[in-house]
């Protein structure tokens, strides 16, 4: 399912917070992998595959400061063993409020309806 799912229009997404060795048995079932900030260098290879840390995926060096490290990850695709550093857009709560305020239409006064 994880390797052929795209052909029929579905995908399997799995997430974990503790990349210990007990997940190694299923890790290879997922052809594409994403690793965000990790605690230890050894965890990088546990998530992205053997040698990923040596090929540049320094996930333990991603900053815990949201202004610097939010959304930063390393991606390893099935077709390429070399991890790529990516960053998803980071939207603050203030940004969301400003967008919502900008999209709210002007209030319309509705006439009273007799009951």
Model regions and ranges:
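Conserved catalytic/switch belt of AAA+ P-loop NTPases
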Residues: 1-7
